[in-house]
Amino acid sequence: MKAALIAQQFAVAGRLVTADTTGQGNVNDTFLVIFRTTFSEERFILQRINKRVFPKPEYVMENMRVVTEHVHRRLEEEAHLSDRIWQLPRIIPAKDGRDYVVDGDGEYWRAISLIASAHSYEKVQSLEHAHEAGFVLGQFQRLIS
């Protein structure tokens, strides 16, 4: 499987256990990847970035790095102001140090940390759910400013 070969090009310790299709994404092809060592297991998300939607995938990854690093700094500065735990995906670098891998077909792939407790919804589940989504979106907008 191509995803398994690509997954092994990222800087992750251990041996590849699986790289299985996951999610119902409309844009990128997404895989849940598991690597295992004798003492630990690392799960992450591998995505083939859709070049029809994102014609410059390298810019997408540069923007993702800049934004996540900025937001992480802001969260560290403001840690004393919140009782919430905020998690952002972490970019897992390729073995060559880049934020992505380009395969033999010119397709771009990225690896990002898995936020195990995260869920994706097709529609709002309740008024409380909508309120929480709005709160989090507002906080994210504030943090990137």
State where each predicted segment sits.
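Conserved ATP-binding subdomain of kinase catalytic cores across diverse folds
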Residues: T18-S145
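A short, low-complexity linker immediately N-terminal to eukaryotic Hanks-type protein kinase catalytic domains
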Residues: K2-R15
